[in-house]
Amino acid sequence: MNPNSNSITKSHLFHIVNPSPWPILTSFALLLLVIGGISSMHGYKFNMYILSAGVISVIYCLYSWWRDVVQEGIVEHQHTSPVRKGLKIGMVLFILTETVFFSVFFASFLKSSISPVGILDGVWVVKQGIWPPPTIKTFDPFDIPFINTLILLLSGTTITGAHYALEEKNQKDCVTALAFTIVLGIFFTLMQVYEYYHAEFKFTDGIYASNFYLATGFHGAHVVIGTIFLIVCYFRAKRGDFTTEGNGHLGFEFAAWYWHFVDVVWLFLFTFVYILGS
């Protein structure tokens, strides 16, 4: 980061990013996180240490990277109109890739439900199975899953209220609505953990269980990431970083987009995995 870069007159409106260690360090941190996750699934030695190191490394790298991006926008004023447009396109493309990512889980779950695999004379045979498998005791969709649906729908309302308050230059209401959204996100995560703790099937108990935990688990991870995103926005809003002039609240806008995306994915999960899957 060059603190004097703002004093240099540029002949264009684009931001030439300074050399940064965070992309490559984040890549290694994610690799460590994946290794830790796989080790935990197989019960390898030191798996929790590796997983914890991966989580801490990813959080630190992302914090440092986003801190630099915020500084480039607020301190160095590098986020000109073309730069903001590029950031918006990047966020839209990111959400589209996430849509494809979750579509794979839905496709796998639906394919397995249409053509369930069962064991016949010791051989895995298509269409000989029952869906859900008789060994799986599914969750009541109108118990904890329904409560979580209401929580996320309410959080979508509060984040929209925060955005509206920001547009109206009402900092107090914006901060309050963000706080409510964060609390709802944390409560959703705690309810999900409670559901997992009382589940009567494990990740390794067949195709239904693995599909269920992968789909809901990755969604839960996205809720945690979104909650962290909102916590950052909460402190930035309290500090007065966000303005309505020149679209000076991209960070908040992206957090709201991401949170609404998480809401929509959950509605599909609730419909296909919990209701139709039960």
Swiss-Prot record:
Q: Where are the coiled-coil regions?
A: none
- Is Transferase given among the entry's keywords? no
Task: Report whether Repeat shows up as a keyword of the record.
Answer: no
For this chain, the family text in UniProt reads:
Belongs to the cytochrome c oxidase subunit 3 family.
Q: Where in the cell is it found?
A: Cell membrane
Give TM regions.
21-41, 46-66, 89-109, 174-194, 212-232, 256-276
Q: Which reaction does it catalyse?
A: 4 Fe(II)-[cytochrome c] + O2 + 8 H(+)(in) = 4 Fe(III)-[cytochrome c] + 2 H2O + 4 H(+)(out)
Q: Which GO terms describe its biological process?
A: aerobic electron transport chain
- Could you tell me the gene encoding this protein? ctaE
Q: What is this protein called?
A: Probable cytochrome c oxidase subunit 3
Identify its membrane topology class.
Answer: Multi-pass membrane protein
Enzyme class comes to: translocase
Species this protein is from: Rickettsia prowazekii (strain Madrid E)
GO molecular function term, any single one: cytochrome-c oxidase activity
Query: What Enzyme Commission number(s) apply to this enzyme?
Result: 7.1.1.9
Keywords assigned: Cell membrane, Membrane, Translocase, Transmembrane, Transmembrane helix
Entries under CDD domains matching the protein: Cyt_c_Oxidase_III
Entry GO terms, CC: plasma membrane
